[in-house]
């Protein structure tokens, strides 16, 4: 809530049928939050779409519950989007709980060739190669702003007018892959996705969601 102190924001929490008292806790401690309590697990895409459809802001920020942001993260992201009219989506530098950089902060489009290089370890062997390192764009400086192909669903800011053109998250993706699909549609609509490392977030479950399985790739 502190991160929204200087931002005109509406906050939605979508609960996918949790059983740990989260719904009641949010209602009690954060009465200003608009909560959607689902009776079953709708999946990532559908749950986020529920909130997006109710949102009224110029920008939409999708943010996982296992993240921690800096107090000025949202301000910096909004300033960047305001200054770059070509930006359809924006992602930030993500680190895990130990402070380690999460490579999924910036990704290329996982074409069959790019996915092959990742699955067979070539991207790890040659991270600085523009040929083999495209999956995580590992040849790009992690401390500089870059145009990228794919935003991470854990934290992605999207211009609302762009969503009007691309459509919302594809609900045929229950979990994983929906961020790739939407990122691709953003670029196909003529906008750019940017990696913005001038602020960072902690993503505690980043290591468990590296999505390195063959099914995901």
Positions of the model-derived regions?
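Short aromatic/hydrophobic "clamp" motif used to bind/position activated sugar donors
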Residues: 60
């Amino acid at each position: 809530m502190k991160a929204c102190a200087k931002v005109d924001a509406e906050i939605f929490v979508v609960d996918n049928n949790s059983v740990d008292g989260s719904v009641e806790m949010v209602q009690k401690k954060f009465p200003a939050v608009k909560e959607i309590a689902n009776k079953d697990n709708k999946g990532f895409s559908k749950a986020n779409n529920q909130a997006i459809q109710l949102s009224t802001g110029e920008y939409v920020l999708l943010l996982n519950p296992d993240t921690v942001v800096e107090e000025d993260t949202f301000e910096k992201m909004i300033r960047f989007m305001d200054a770059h009219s070509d930006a359809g989506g924006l992602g930030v530098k993500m680190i895990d709980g130990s402070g380690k950089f999460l490579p999924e902060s910036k990704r290329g489009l996982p074409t069959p060739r790019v996915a092959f290089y990742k699955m067979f370890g070539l991207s790890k062997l040659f991270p600085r190669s523009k040929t083999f390192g495209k999956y995580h764009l590992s040849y790009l400086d992690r401390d500089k702003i870059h145009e990228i192909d794919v935003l991470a669903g854990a934290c992605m800011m999207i211009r609302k007018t762009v969503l009007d053109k691309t459509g919302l998250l594809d609900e045929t993706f229950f979990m994983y892959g929906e961020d790739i699909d939407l990122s691709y549609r953003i670029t196909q609509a003529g906008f750019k996705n940017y990696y913005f490392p001038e602020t960072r977030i902690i993503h505690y479950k980043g290591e468990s969601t590296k999505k390195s399985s063959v099914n995901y790739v």
